[in-house]
Amino acid sequence: MALKIVDKFRKKSDKDQYLVALDIGTEYVKALIGRVVDNQVEIIGVGRQHQRLTDMQSGAVTDIAGVVDNCDAALRQAEEMAGVVGKDTVMGIAGELVKGTATTIKYKRTDAQSRIEMPELRNILDRVQDRAFERARETLAWETGQQEIDVKMVNTAIVDVQIDGYRVTNPIGFQGRDVTIQLFNAFAPMVHIGALQQVANNLDLNTINIAAEPFAVAKSVGGEDTADFSAIFID
């Protein structure tokens, strides 16, 4: 009966926009189906499935086939509740091998009278990300004992920008000499990311984003207009 309900609404999901959120935890897989309404997501389906001890370790997938079965069970629960099938998914990534780092760079502009444009800002951000990438790679290499470990950035966000000591939310168009930018980046090993992508492929889902879960939680609570917001999250 559940499959008939899903099939009945399958065509509807082609007209409306739905998103699937998958949180593949060490103990449980959690699945959400949401309807996109005015740039917000209305949750219409929820499901979860217990994982075996051999499926995950420290937040990382160790048995792709086992995790696929668990995700499928959680998705069926969410689909039955929602009455629709989503195809686009956002997957959470966590665990001890996901590294988040805040990097600060300070530099003096040669022409303080010129206005900051996008190419200049992009060059600064690239330098910050390169520095953060090497730091994350060195940390993961030390922790895993693998010197040639492939790492990929999963999230990035500007935390703070100051020009001549003056805090701004968008540096484009400003003049000044001393620029300080703090950038948060989250990195994860490619083997970890590749396992999640394979899980999504086996479930016939289109992965639109893989997000670092601690970053996603802070982003959803903090918002865009709360530069002075700070909090401690306890799981």
Functional labels for PLM-detected ranges:
Residues M1-Y28, L32-T89, I93-I232:
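Nucleotide/phosphate-binding catalytic cleft detector across ATP-hydrolyzing
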